[in-house]
């Protein structure tokens, strides 16, 4: 299976790349917007490091840029000097590369348009919520408040937001107090679920379609007070 990582210059893309090469997946990269967005490695504090050691989840070296990750493991990548993921240049490049599967890891707020799906190539996305019941933004914090756990859903995208055929779901223990949720926890649990999803695809596990009558709630960017309450609800390490 020929896998393409369609990636912006983000911590999530870097996390995906390191999980993919660590699990020996043969991938190519199509990197876009790197000329506009500079990568900044996040600080790693004690609580974050020890949480992932205790959880037995691989902690990527986010000091290393994604290009270095690809170079070190002999993976090919191409750059497109476009920030708009829906640009004709990017879509034409994807078509020319001819992947069997695209892993989408774009910039925040970007939504793929119809032209991507007209390529008839499946696009895989990892959503930090229990689809179809938890859609939208900052669902991790709502999950912590509502159920004291976090789910990642891997699904094949379509033109609807946070909708498509479900490939895999993984439930994770919530982070402990002072773990870096936005930069480490969110991206690492998504990367971990990505590997499970690719294994599911290769093993031809059953795909679950979304219910026709979707009664899910749409979550929007969480209010700072609610976000703080969810953080305060976390246990100490």
Descriptions of predicted regions:
Residues 1-237:
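One-carbon transfer enzymes
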